[in-house]
């Protein structure tokens, strides 16, 4: 259904827009000295991790190296999608696998990464500012364009803003950064994940409740009630628990026994493939349902504007090369399913969220490849 719906979309126009964006960013790469410094100063070991060799930096065949890191991510998503469409598994099997990923595999990966991490005295605050500044700009632009250009209800505008800025950091970002940047990138992403979901859900909930109150009236919950609910969810969040245990292990200097370390490594290694396959299985529920103009616009904001803003802020704040690469790559991934969950919670904006998720996932391989190439 996803593929058939996507086929009806104006592929020629989208391809032309993609080529124009590609040419613009390529010009930016060659003219902007900051990007050149970033590219030329990448250590050899990280360049190789990104699929880059010194020789291939100056030649087009480098794109095949990018594809070697990016293509497996989307192939695994496609495999998950096909297993449900072919009738091999029911869609609810994907939900069970997703629960395993969120509650066991990813927290274990975060624990292992942080327990062994060397932070080199880096502060997480610049990392958080870098990412969420990009989110704030993109979310605001998405909201304003939907409200005043597409003339939509304020509640639809909020959902569109969320869809333009809510990256699928867990199910696509983690495997992508792990393959492309390595452990240093996973450290950055683990620190981001500690507050990403709470911040995005608090902001989305408050804005939606305010928008609903403006549109239809009725009782509005106070911010204290919202923070209380989110705080309650936060202390039981498996990602936060994995982060706290990992940091505690790192600070205390406790070493895992060989047997326990092997178990942790094996579970952590399952996080990426299981996350991608479960996402593909879940995508059978998120089809293109309408509001194509808004959805395509939000997809462009999500895949191009958000990572561009993140790169600009990270460069301005002097964030390390590896952390900047990790944040830009994870911000370039498709829209996460939480955008649809918020729409479902408030009973409006389903088509905008679902269509943006579907279109951004179908075209995400292009944006991820583009940003991996630019970062090289």
Model-derived regions, located:
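Alpha-helical transmembrane segments of multi-pass small-molecule/ion transporters
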Residues: 32-33, 45-376
